[in-house]
A protein has these predicted regions:
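Catalytic palm active-site di-aspartate
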Residues: 43-45
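Auxiliary tRNA-acceptor-end handling modules of aminoacyl-tRNA synthetases
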Residues: 1-14, 35-38, 47-204
Length: 204
């Protein structure tokens, strides 16, 4: 891999990581009381694990997010990007960070912070009104966000432990250009069509 290709790879990974924060910011606006687990960049995209058990609907029941909700979440994300933002970096000590997580009702963040050693300095990134503890790295601003699409909702145990809470995981994909995104989505569609034809033959 050339140095230019390496820089491009690093940039798209940072962009995907930033998009997980954009999604979290959108979810915070849409679902007050939502709790967050972790939201990394992954191959081709990003995800964030969330807990909606304290977010109540008009019927008094906990709100659930399904694939049908993804277009409106994506729309909110695009609105945040259109408003413009710069990722603001800051550092806080462990006790201040712990107090912040407790004050904001972020129990999963509390668990992560409590495992850190005393005296640990913790990095934060702020995107508009949304703040999250995070090691980074991220892109600098909304202008560096490329093409993205939210793909699906799944369940995921907190920290991969089936004895812990089942969280809602929201997946997205992201690329530098709309053309790359379109190519990726077309490949997925072709793979699904092949699988469907294969299944049809097996059932004949």
């Amino acid at each position: 891999m050339s140095s230019t290709e390496n820089l491009e790879t690093q940039h798209v990974e940072r962009m995907r990581h930033t998009l997980s924060h954009v999604m979290a910011a959108a979810l915070t606006e849409m679902y007050p009381g939502i709790e967050f687990g972790v939201g990394p960049a992954i191959k081709d995209g990003f995800y964030y694990d969330v807990d909606l058990s304290k977010v109540k609907g008009s019927d008094g029941e906990a709100v659930k997010i399904s694939d049908a909700d993804l277009p409106k979440i994506e729309k909110k994300m695009r609105g945040i990007i259109a408003r413009g933002f710069e990722m603001q970096y800051s550092e806080k000590d462990r006790d201040t960070t712990l107090a912040w997580a407790k004050e904001n009702g972020q129990e999963y963040k509390v668990e992560l912070i409590e495992e850190l050693p005393e005296g640990e300095v913790i990095s934060f990134y702020q995107l508009g009104d949304f703040t999250d503890l995070c090691k980074g790295p991220h892109v600098g601003s909304a202008k560096e966000i490329g093409a993205f699409k939210l793909m699906r909702v799944a369940g995921a145990y907190w920290r991969g432990d089936e004895k812990k809470a089942m969280l809602t995981r929201i997946y997205g994909v992201a690329f530098e250009t709309e053309e790359e995104l379109k190519t990726y989505l077309n490949r997925l569609e072709e793979a699904r069509a092949r699988d469907h034809r294969k299944l049809g033959k097996e059932l004949d």
